[in-house]
Regions:
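C-terminal accessory/regulatory regions appended to core domains
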Residues: 2-235
Length: 235
């Protein structure tokens, strides 16, 4: 199959898309900070149940509680589970959470709380980065729906698309000036914008197979973007 041969060439060139790990815009509100502590507070033994306020601290002794690993990134960052995200509000939420759980604020607390703080901060960072970029957001949203894109396959990409990627790679390999690389960057940026709009519509229709196809293409172009960045770094 031609696609298989093209895939082999893409692997040789290092252009195989690497894995990446994010409707209505998100809304940030105080209610989203509520959580639960079903097993009770580790510090004072306060019984579990609904936790008022920020949801990260025991309402009785105010000890930082362990992260809720069952909570998905959209819930943590107070977003609707949607591809459409208000990135300004997402950033506000990120800053809000880091002001609550960043390790710098726990230097004088118990070792247990220091450890929990590290875990909370890492989780918030991962959630923010994932939902900020359209590609990783889309892949994560698919994963929540039980749909994943296998690594190391061309996912039945059509011949025309694979030819486009290979030609772009050839141009990048031949590019000897910053202007030439900027031209390729511009083309990729336009392609990614178009694909982002298309995948947004696919998610709105709950057409996850179409979203999967589009995100695979976005992953190819993202790989090209990384190659451009590497080529710009002085040796």
């Amino acid at each position: 199959m031609w696609g298989g041969r093209a895939g082999a060439l893409l692997r040789v060139w290092g252009l195989w898309p690497a894995g990446v790990l994010g409707r209505r815009p998100l809304s940030c509100n105080a209610a989203s900070l509520a959580g639960s502590n079903p097993s009770g507070c580790w510090n004072c033994g306060s019984p579990g149940g609904p936790v008022r306020g920020d949801g990260f601290f025991c309402p009785q002794c105010r000890a930082l509680q362990p992260p809720d690993l069952t909570r998905d990134y959209f819930s943590l960052m107070d977003c609707n589970r949607s591809f459409r995200v208000d990135t300004a509000k997402l950033q506000q939420r990120y800053q809000q959470l880091q002001r609550l759980v960043h390790p710098d604020f726990f230097s004088q607390r118990s070792q247990t709380e220091k450890d929990f703080s590290e875990k909370h901060s890492t989780l918030v960072n991962d959630a923010y980065k994932t939902l900020l970029a359209p590609l990783s957001r889309g892949l994560y949203l698919l994963k929540l729906r039980g749909v994943e894109i296998p690594e190391g396959t061309d996912y039945e990409m059509d011949r025309q698309f694979l030819m486009e990627i290979m030609e772009m790679n050839e141009k990048l390999a031949e590019a000897q000036s910053e202007a030439a690389m900027k031209e390729i960057e511009s083309v990729v940026r336009v392609k990614q914008k178009e694909l982002t709009d298309n995948v947004s519509r696919a998610f709105e229709r709950d057409d996850f197979e179409k979203a999967k196809e589009i995100l695979t293409k976005m992953r190819y172009f993202s790989n090209v973007e990384e190659k451009i960045k590497l080529k710009k770094i002085p040796v």
